[in-house]
């Protein structure tokens, strides 16, 4: 039972948490449309600090959700996730990547309506290709080729590396990919948000 769940849960967890974690970032577009943002920025808060605070909330929310799912699944189904220090490191890496990905998606949307269309499409596509909905090994070969470049697949590989007690060097590539996604995604999102929100403030 637990072995079967280990095939499905890591990818499914990453997918679910992405939807939970994007909530603080959705508030940015909401604050913009409801004209709350000018009042916030009237306080001693810069635009960069405001966006960073939303990203930090996203990171914390993703970390807590991942930790809770791991603990609950271990208690209910007896899943052995591996050494706690490595597991904590993977949770942090997951959360960094989720923050970068969701921030970038939200920053590319001009309105909440656009974000509500773009975000599910992108996240569902990654989920289908990366093994969050079906076991990755059961996918057709051409989909596996595409899926190996998705954050969902990288997340599964990092978690299974910890579960099977592999040396970190054996799954350093997906770790590096997730960290790169998190850092680059966050930096690009900051640039896009500053342009969009700064232009909106000038109107």
Which residue ranges define each predicted feature?
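Transmembrane helix-boundary elements of multi-pass transport/secretion proteins
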Residues: 1-42, 47-66, 79-84, 117, ...
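Short amphipathic alpha-helical coupling elements at transmembrane boundaries
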Residues: 38-42, 107-110, 148, 161
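Residue-level recognition of pore/gate-forming positions within transmembrane alpha-helices
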Residues: 58, 91, 120-124, 153-154, ...
